[in-house]
Amino acid sequence: HHSKHHATYVKGANDALEKLEEARAKDDQSTVLLNEKNLAFNLAGHVNHTIWWKNLSPNGGDKPTGELAAAIDDAFGSFDKFRAQFHAAATTVQGSGWAALGWDNLGEKLLIFQVYDHQSNFPLGVVPLLLLDMWEHA
């Protein structure tokens, strides 16, 4: 997964940056827009996978403690309710995407949401903490 899918997003982002520079030099606005879209997709794929790798642990799977446990209880009522909502978000992604847990800096609480494909449709002000890859290859 790391050497195939993740590496493809890194290469795609680098390629899009090169093509974007060329298109800007030629003042080719339609190609600029196309490559900005390609850059956003591939860069988001890279960032999402980078967070996902950090979430994986050979000894993981236990309930959180401390501030995270308190924030989960505050936002969802209990760890079991959090897990049920996160599971629902993950298993109902239409097509390809991600389930996400993020910290809302404005509301100062945890939120669960879906990310479609790799498009970083995180709500503004939300920092992703936990991502679960729900693409068919995952």
UniProtKB/Swiss-Prot annotation:
InterPro entries cross-referenced by the UniProt entry: Fe/Mn_Superoxide_Dismutase (IPR050265), Mn/Fe_SOD (IPR001189), Mn/Fe_SOD_C (IPR019832), Mn/Fe_SOD_N (IPR019831), Mn/Fe_SOD_N_sf (IPR036324), SOD_C_sf (IPR036314)
Keywords associated with the record: Manganese, Metal-binding, Oxidoreductase
Keyword Manganese: yes
EC number of the protein: 1.15.1.1
GO molecular function: metal ion binding; superoxide dismutase activity
Top-level division of the source organism's lineage: Bacteria
UniProt cofactor(s): Mn(2+)
Reaction catalyzed: 2 superoxide + 2 H(+) = H2O2 + O2
Record carries keyword Metal-binding: yes
Cofactor note: Binds 1 Mn(2+) ion per subunit.
Cysteines engaged in disulfide bonds, as pairs: none
Sequence positions that bind Mn(2+): H1, H49, D133, H137
Role, per record: Destroys superoxide anion radicals which are normally produced within the cells and which are toxic to biological systems.
Family: Belongs to the iron/manganese superoxide dismutase family.
Record protein name field: Superoxide dismutase [Mn]
Gene source species: Mycobacterium celatum
Name of the gene this protein is made from: sodA
